[in-house]
């Protein structure tokens, strides 16, 4: 959520920045109209309360019963007026907050302007679009031939966009998760295990609501929601708390399954595990002082890149343009790995600085020094990494001509020393 003071003091600049992201600035006018109503109602409430206090003092000094009764009646009328004004004020404040929650974050000056994802800028690359010395097979062919991916039974269990991993495939999935968490521990993150369901308020705090409501799974009976990313519960950890400056920075890493209902077009990514309604991800999350947040973003980016590097995957880092920037982000790097079987660069991490956007929604503050007025922290989030596409890249880059898959060296200790995935039934 943006700072209302910024909107009041620089409405034209806010509109200009929103326009960079293709957002109509009319909502800023709505917020300001609600703000004007709110301030007028506050003034009227305070004026009526002052009148009531004055009448109350007069009553105490009155001896004439008729005059006293008239003043008591005047106080009652003022009380009714105050109650009605308070009701109107609460309604306007709710309307203003609802409008504020619809406004995306503003892009950082470094973010390039653009009209779509083709305007994203590659800022770093290690490795090329690897060409194998034999025809590269896509991961779904490899997985089915090796008996480690079972799409038919995934559909049987849960419907389209679900799959089952078997044997060495399931072990590979588990190995990647554990290795990533251990790596982030060495990078300075504290591992966190959170619920995989959250209250609705936590989704509002993280910025998932209202924008992504149609993509989320909700249990109607309990009112709890399945997490679409560990970013959501990690944001909510310190909601409505005041941290001390000495506690910052806080670096957390968490694994969760992620659940999303997003509707996918029939002709796009219909094969394989690239897009599904349930997937695993390890998330990195930071709470930092405002003046340190862009330095922290570079650490987040380096830590995500290190994951791809140690796995031996060709990768590149893109700075997202304004058209591709997420709702809450001011600046985002995407890390993509090359997958020769599908012939694509696949996004495995998105590292974003959201500044105080989430902290303001979640009311997460810190004291710059003892006794100082609390200020909002800055928060950052980054995938470290998203598993389906990481698994795709491992399978397709490490495939052998005989259809087996070599296991990256860093993962072998997590798989009991296994060096190669072969068809166990062969």
Curated annotation (Swiss-Prot):
Any one GO biological process: seryl-tRNA aminoacylation
Pfam short name (any one): tRNA-synt_2b
Location within or outside the cell: Cytoplasm
Pathway(s) annotated for this protein in UniProt: Aminoacyl-tRNA biosynthesis; selenocysteinyl-tRNA(Sec) biosynthesis; L-seryl-tRNA(Sec) from L-serine and tRNA(Sec): step 1/1
GO molecular function, one term: ATP binding
Transit peptide in keyword set: no
GO CC list: cytoplasm
Binding site residues for ATP: 260-262, 347-350
Reactions this protein catalyses: tRNA(Ser) + L-serine + ATP = L-seryl-tRNA(Ser) + AMP + diphosphate + H(+); tRNA(Sec) + L-serine + ATP = L-seryl-tRNA(Sec) + AMP + diphosphate + H(+)
Summary of subunit composition and partner proteins: Homodimer. The tRNA molecule binds across the dimer.
Domain notes per entry: Consists of two distinct domains, a catalytic core and a N-terminal extension that is involved in tRNA binding.
Protein name: Serine--tRNA ligase
Originating organism: Chloroflexus aggregans (strain MD-66 / DSM 9485)
